[in-house]
Amino acid sequence: MQFRTVLDVKVVDVEKRRNPSKHYVYLINVTYSDSTSHIIYRRYSKFFDLQMQILDKFPIEGGQKDPKKRIIPFLPGKILFRRSHVRDVAMKRLRFIDDYCRALVRLPPQISQSEEVLRFFETKPDDINPPVEDYGSKRKSGLDSSEPMVLEQYVVVANYERQENSEISLKAGETVDVIEKSESGWWFVSTAEEQGWVPATYLDSQSGTRDDLDLGTSRSGEVTKRRKAHLKRLDRRWTLGGIVNRQQSREEKYVSVQAYASQGKDEIGFEKGVTVEVIQKNLEGWWYIRYQGKEGWAPASYLKKLKDDLSPRKKTLTGPVEIIGNIMEISNLLNKKAVSEKDIQTDGEATTPERHISKSEISLPMPYAPEAGVAPTVVTALGMNSGSSATLQENKSRAEPGSPAIARVAPHRVEIGSPNLRQKPPPRRDANLAFQLPKPPEAPTVEAEYYTIAEFQSSISDGISFRGGQKADVIEKNSGGWWYVQIGDTEGWAPSSYIDKRKKPNLSRRTSTLTRPKVPPPAPPVKKQDSEEGPSLGGSASKAPESPQRVYEEPEYDVPALGFDSELDCNPPKPKTHNSPKPEPRKFEIKSNPAAAERIAQAGKASPLLKVMTSPLRKRNSLENINKEEVIYENEGFRFSSDDFASGCDSHTPRSLTLGRKPFGSSSGGGKPLRKVSPDLNRSHSLGRAERHSSKLFSDESARNPKREPVMRKDVEIRIGQSPLARPKPVVRPKPLLTKSEPQSPERMDISSIRRHLRPTGSLRQGAIRAMRGEDSETASVVSSEDSTSSRSTSDLSSVYSKGSRGGESDHESVLFRTTDAYERAQESELSFPAGVEVEVLEKQESGWWFVRWGSDEGWVPTFYLEPIKHTHNVGIQESRDSPLVDLGSTNKSNSLEKNEQRVQALNNLNQQNLRSMSNPSPPIPSKPPGGFSKPTAMLNGSSVRMRNGVRQAAVRPQSVFVSPPQPLKETNIHTGSLRRNESLGAGDHLRSTGGVRRNSSFTAVRPQPVTDVRVRAGTTITAPAGSSSPLIAQRNGIPISTVRPKPIEKMQLIHNNLREVYVSIADYRGDEETMGFSEGTSLEVLEKNPNGWWYCQVLDGLQGRKGWVPSNYLERKK
């Protein structure tokens, strides 16, 4: 081979060749590097072989490892089920092969000058002296040559369900293209979507004739032969064998390969291995045969040609031989004249006295007696002698079906086998169908569209690049795996593996949950509530009061509520008006006896404690409509009085409580509703021990702020779900880690995040501050007063922790804070700052993260790194333990209570720090979210986050608060008995003689007294019986606070207690690699308490005390 390269290639034309078989070659003008050019001739199969060689030799350039790196051009795929050796197909391929050749020679030299490419374009002897064929007068015009290219179309006459994988299902009225006809009666057809085998008896020609179903000869001595060599690789029986119409007029003899029992009067049964004479063949799978002097129909797949019958046939081939290259050309035989100039290779023609079969004769329906099972309906002759013709004429005159006719097939007879095995015959055609069938309806169309499923970057000139999810219009499908599509205004070839089909979406059903965030966003703004759903367990819904204001219903998400198996509604949120029907309340599965559950549900309808969690946007004049409820307190629990369960609530008051509105967010994203969940809430699982003592409660809520929503309503749902008779096991583990407030996307932005952009001014800001303040009570405090001065650190912490989270008391409250330590941000939305700089607080959230501005930078920072520059509140408290009944309408008392609460939380935070600094180092706090509530924050670096200081854990605060008289650090070892759960340890204040706030202690039974007037802050419920000395503030997150005086705690009692805190577990807990497991009733000593709800404890029951982190809501103070 001379070494010369190819400079240019151009495909100019196609040419038909008949040696060795009919095919087309492409005329290619090749320009070589030696400035010579030649015309070479290559057929498509040669291009295909070249492409395979190149792809095998250059896998990387062929895109086998990475499709994006493919530079080898694409070649049009092979045509497997259509005729490829026709001129029209060759002309369609010409443009693509020309592009392929041009791109191939422009590839890098290692490919374009490879041995395979040069050998392909090398001039061969056949290219210099191409074979010359004498076409004579065979082709007068190009029209005749393109006639066989069009596939015949048939209409499906009845529905057909596929029986095997190689078959396809059909629907009546559908139009199919017949690709291959088989003598077994199974045809290979193509629909708009798929190809496969179907019984021919389910198809009817669109022209109404059935002449194309039969194999026949119109002259004696002709041999009809089918060849489809290029499809042999599909491993199917593509050939039917030769059919000879001898001058001796002998019927062909076949041997039965399987026994057949006749199913009708016109059929012939036979045993296996017998010889039968085939009188007539057709392509529907049923042949007319003669056996033992009887004639009838038999399945063609049960018959096999006798081998000894082939030799005499060859000897008697004296007439012209007609070679038909494709089964589709058989239909042309009956449409031609006596001599077809197109396909005859010899001009010899024999004449016989045998008559020719006309087209009209083939299509005539045959009469048949109605009592017959299945009748032949079409006469089709297949080159028979005069004796056979006489037999047919004689059979026509009889009423019995003896004529060789195509039996119409009953579609319901679907005992079919595999088209590959061809053992079972196809169903017979029903006589009633015949040609009296009405015109079948149009095929049903299913509106579908194509779309891209991934991004694709094309590296070829006629390719197309696209992104995932784009709509694509498929213009042409290529079997090689490349489709010509249009995306937008561009067209090009795209890999079919990147394109998928889907049903065209209906605009009225575009409520897919795919775009819904998996994490519920913060609660939306709540307008003035006119009505809320009644309790789901009670089954009674309250009627909405008449009000022109609209109520925005909370959206519901596919997130389960804490500790419940709820039936969640996936409907999007809809605005509710005062006259809109209430949705069905959500049902929860509460593990308790039904009676107890019902009592709790009914009590929840008007519980003042539950009303604390409902919207604070109520008018003061609604006080007159508030009913009385009895609440029982013992130790740390509460329970509704059973004698008042049936009282219900006024359906026309705004006191109707939403029990099934929305499960609060338990997710991995950490939205705002998620951070409202505290271990204090879980403590409520052990509430409600007895029903012996009760006290009357009144509640009222003032409408202050229209921009806040009481998300702690969801906490109340959990509390209601607990059993009132038995101590329930905790169903929710505490949240060990606070996930910070994420910067929200526009679709998830709520009113609290909008406040950062549109800060409230004037009275609106005051209302927001007051509303937030009323909702944010952290613990209830019953503090006997003795005025004492707290240290600066206590005051600072008090304002930061308690007052600061409320957003400030008034407009003149200081918004400037000073950083106490350096902080490095862990996310983009946070703000890093050094120690000792002044920052301006733009938004305060109770989650423990504030949005501040430092210079020109803004971002979220933890509150424990900030201290106020100017203090506006004094934490001095003046209150007597034996004071008379508190005037609940007094503003001074409310302020005093809030100051007490601030002091409690400040002392608690300070002492938490002291306690952790004094205690021994403990293992790292579990970083996983217990109960699946929150995604653990990945930023747990020790120095910057300061886990021991509660950073990122402000949303989950200590279980209970006991304010002991603070002691100097040096006296801590003396007053060890003053500590209760999460109590202060070594605060900077002096010891006071008054009692502190305690939650876990037993309360004295006090006779509840009715109170007629209630004046409280928005979002709180304060009730005091006669004889009580201290007002109570109900905690915002739902922890019940006793309304009676606590048992006095004397100074000596506090002193004589030791530092050792022993708790007992109230339920079994399975530990893991980060936490310690224990069984119910295990005694544990608390070594360290973390405000996020995890306590570091030591087991006291075993010989070797195990240590580890345990959830605090599984523990109860050992009495």
From Swiss-Prot:
Belongs to the SH3PXD2 family. One of its GO terms (cellular component) is anchoring junction. This is SH3 and PX domain-containing protein 2A. Residues 779-802 have a biased composition (Low complexity). It is found in: Cytoplasm; Cell projection, Podosome. Residues 149-208, 249-308, 445-504, 812-871, 1058-1119 form the SH3 domain. Residues 388-429, 494-595, 641-815, 914-941, 957-1004 are annotated as: Disordered. PANTHER family: SH3 AND PX DOMAIN-CONTAINING PROTEIN 2A, SH3 MULTIPLE DOMAIN. Keywords: Cell junction, Cell projection, Cytoplasm, Phosphoprotein, Repeat, SH3 domain. The PX domain is required for podosome localization because of its ability to bind phosphatidylinositol 3-phosphate (PtdIns(3)P) and phosphatidylinositol 3,4-bisphosphate (PtdIns(3,4)P2) and, to a lesser extent, phosphatidylinositol 4-phosphate (PtdIns(4)P), phosphatidylinositol 5-phosphate (PtdIns(5)P), and phosphatidylinositol 3,5-bisphosphate (PtdIns(3,5)P2). Binds to the third intramolecular SH3 domain. Residues 581-590, 688-718, 806-815 have a biased composition (Basic and acidic residues). One of its GO terms (biological process) is reactive oxygen species metabolic process. GO terms for molecular function: phosphatidylinositol binding; superoxide-generating NADPH oxidase activator activity. PROSITE patterns: PX, SH3. The gene is sh3pxd2a. Residues 4-128 form the PX domain. Adapter protein involved in invadopodia and podosome formation and extracellular matrix degradation. Signal peptide: none annotated. Tyrosine phosphorylated. It comes from Danio rerio (Zebrafish).
